[in-house]
Amino acid sequence: MKPAKSSPVQIARRGLMLVISSPSGAGKSTIARTLLETDKHIGLSVSVTTRPRRPSEVEGVHYHFKSVREFERLRDSDALLEWAEVHGNFYGTPREPVEQAMAEGRDMLFDIDWQGAQQLQEKMSADVVSIFVLPPTMTELQSRLHRRAEDSEEVIQTRLANSRAEIAHWREYDYVIVNDDLNTAFDAVQSIVKAERLRRDRRHGMFDFVRELLEETPSL
């Protein structure tokens, strides 16, 4: 007769704020989408933006699309954890769902730029794990933007012009990944998430677990 299989040990921990940034076309959105599809413990922090909705985007799934006036109302009432102006449009992170997720031990994914990442680091540094995704070459970055076929040529050129300034902030991130192969880059992100979830300072339930472990007296 086989011994009964014990249940997995569950140790309470605080949620993780996983920030993934990159210049447009480097692959952060694809990596983020794949991570959400394969890891049920991660939820997406849906940003608000004044940017026009692309044909492939769904309200409330990819972004909450707002007018400039609506966005300013949220910003001025301190309802946003961070906000930034990118390519002439405003982006921001709603405060309430993030703070609730952290307290409940749920991980949140942030697909935001360096300005937003910087603000999150300043406000909630203990919870933030930041990853910057680089393209293998600028030529490949340009090719990816054209293959995406969702922006006008003028917008693509603006994104390319801004990409060098964005890449200059790579040193501000905890981890940096070169996305020359999507599967390899995704595997690296998964490894980072697994390791960060095991950090001692994030697992507040470990104190009770160790105390009970030391108090346990095995029966003979």
UniProtKB/Swiss-Prot annotation:
Enzyme class name: transferase
Subcellular location: Cytoplasm
Gene3D superfamilies: Guanylate Kinase phosphate binding domain, P-loop containing nucleotide triphosphate hydrolases
Limits of the Guanylate kinase-like domain: 15-194
InterPro entries associated with the record: GK/Ca_channel_bsu, Guanylate_kin-like_dom, Guanylate_kinase, Guanylate_kinase_CS, P-loop_NTPase
Record's keyword terms, sorted: ATP-binding, Cytoplasm, Kinase, Nucleotide-binding, Transferase
Catalytic activity, EC: 2.7.4.8
SMART domains: GuKc
Residues involved in ATP binding: S22, P23, S24, G25, A26, G27, K28, S29
UniProt-recorded Gene Ontology molecular function terms: ATP binding; guanylate kinase activity
GO CC, alphabetical: cytosol
Reaction equation(s) it catalyzes: GMP + ATP = GDP + ADP
Family membership noted in the UniProt record: Belongs to the guanylate kinase family.
Functional note: Essential for recycling GMP and indirectly, cGMP.
Protein name in UniProt: Guanylate kinase
